[in-house]
């Protein structure tokens, strides 16, 4: 399991910008959208599901997920919400 400090260090080495903490309230969702940047996240607490055209991935505390730029996806926080670090590239 990767901790917050190691995640920040790895992201910096991989060319990502500073990490930002994001919080979703329980069951908060974002409809399908894209970003003009790649993103990598580390779940600090809770659960989040990212749904793309061909699959869904549920990440829990300690999990890392990366998404390339311009990939359509939706985001769904878990029943108890989610707190995660996210970096852009």
Predicted regions located by residue number:
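A short, N-terminal "cap"/entry segment at the start of jelly-roll beta-barrel domains
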Residues: 1-23
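Conserved short histidine dyad/triad with adjacent acidic residue
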Residues: 18-35, 69-70
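A generic beta-sheet turn/junction motif
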Residues: 25, 36, 52, 77-79
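Short, conserved beta-strand element in jelly-roll/cupin
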Residues: 34-50
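Structural motif
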Residues: 47-49, 56, 72, 81
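Short acidic-glycine-tyrosine-enriched beta hairpin
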Residues: 53-70
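Ligand-binding loop in jelly-roll beta-barrel domains
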Residues: 69-89
């Amino acid at each position: 399991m990767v901790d917050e400090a190691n995640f920040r260090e790895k992201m910096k080495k991989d060319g990502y910008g500073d990490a930002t903490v994001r919080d979703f309230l329980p069951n908060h969702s974002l409809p399908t959208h894209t970003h003009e940047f790649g993103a990598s996240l580390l779940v600090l607490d809770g659960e989040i599901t990212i749904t793309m055209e061909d699959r869904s991935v549920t990440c829990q505390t300690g999990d890392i997920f990366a998404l390339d730029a311009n990939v359509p996806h939706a985001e769904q926080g878990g029943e108890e919400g989610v707190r995660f670090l996210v970096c852009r590239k």
